[in-house]
């Protein structure tokens, strides 16, 4: 592909070239001044370049300056003397030797004895505390059964030799847990009472329904018990009527049978 003339004019070409150089330098270095960087590299590798253009640089071009040297690191302040070095002669011996020697020189026999007694008392107190802690942490913590016992333990005076046992928390946490447990118990009791009231009302309504329906059922049962009696009576009546009919038919037949005999007798008598 053949080269073609650029589209931009001279100022546009220069701007694009400057921007390309700036971006290429920014891609590999972060100093922010690629002109000074190029001048430094040119002086290091002995590349002086061609002669300057005639007439000097165009007006408005920035003057190329050499990069400034980095400021020197601040000097470290002198180290302060260690506490107890013994003043001016602290460097002569180990730390703490001069001060302890001066303090021992100023203390008397009685003061030294008091100091030793205080050290022994502190050691004994620390041993007692460690023993009490070991004794308390060996066994499980004592449970709290009632609210009064919990209040008495929380309001009791603080024991300097005491310590917290395992599986126990602070007073605020225990109080919060206790209040949560109380609220849960209260809610369950309310639910139980509500269910009990509902059950009682249901039983009362059921009894009322049964009491209201019982006379109706008794009346219906009475009616059901009377029906077979009425049927038997009707049957008896039917039977009685049929017997009456048979008796009447029998009497009529007997009368009819007796009438010709009478007639025959009468005829015989007449002859």
Swiss-Prot record:
The keyword Phosphoprotein applies. InterPro entries: DUF755, HEV_TT_vir_Orf2/Gyrovir_Vp2_N. It holds the Pfam family TT_ORF2-like. Transmembrane segments: none annotated. Keywords: Phosphoprotein. Residues 207-216 have a biased composition (Basic and acidic residues). It comes from the Viruses. Residues 50-61 have a biased composition (Pro residues). Residues 49-103, 124-146, 203-271 are annotated as: Disordered. Residues 87-99 have a biased composition (Gly residues). Residues 239-259 have a biased composition (Low complexity). The keyword Transferase does not apply. Residues 217-238 have a biased composition (Basic residues). Phosphorylated at C-terminal serines. This is Probable protein VP2. It comes from Torque teno virus (isolate Human/Japan/SANBAN/1999) (TTV). The lineage of its organism: Viruses, Viruses incertae sedis, Anelloviridae, Torque teno virus.
């Amino acid at each position: 592909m053949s080269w073609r003339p650029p589209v931009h004019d001279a100022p546009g070409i220069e701007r694009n070239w400057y921007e390309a150089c700036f971006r290429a330098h920014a891609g590999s270095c972060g100093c922010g001044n690629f002109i000074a960087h190029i001048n430094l590299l040119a002086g290091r590798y002995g590349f002086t370049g061609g002669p300057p253009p005639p007439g000097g640089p165009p007006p408005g071009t920035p003057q190329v300056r050499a990069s400034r040297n980095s400021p020197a690191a601040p000097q470290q302040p002198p180290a302060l003397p260690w506490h107890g070095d013994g003043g001016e002669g602290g460097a002569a011996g180990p730390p703490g030797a001069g001060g302890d020697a001066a303090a021992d020189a100023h203390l008397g026999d009685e003061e030294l004895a008091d100091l030793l007694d205080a050290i022994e008392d502190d050691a004994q107190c620390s041993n007692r505390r460690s023993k009490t802690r070991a004794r308390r942490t060996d066994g499980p913590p004592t449970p709290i059964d009632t609210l009064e016992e919990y209040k008495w333990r929380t309001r009791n005076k603080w024991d300097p030799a005491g310590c917290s046992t395992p599986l126990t928390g602070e007073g605020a946490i225990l109080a919060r847990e206790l209040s949560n447990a109380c609220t849960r118990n209260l809610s369950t009791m309310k639910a139980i009472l509500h269910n009990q009231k509902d059950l009682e009302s249901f039983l009362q309504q059921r009894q009322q329904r049964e009491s209201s329906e019982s006379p109706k059922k008794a009346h219906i049962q009475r009616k059901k018990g009377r029906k077979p009696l009425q049927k038997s009576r009707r049957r008896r009546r039917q039977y009685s009527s049929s017997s009456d009919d048979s008796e009447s038919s029998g009497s009529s037949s007997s009368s009819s049978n007796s009438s010709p005999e009478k007639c025959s007798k009468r005829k015989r008598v007449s002859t």
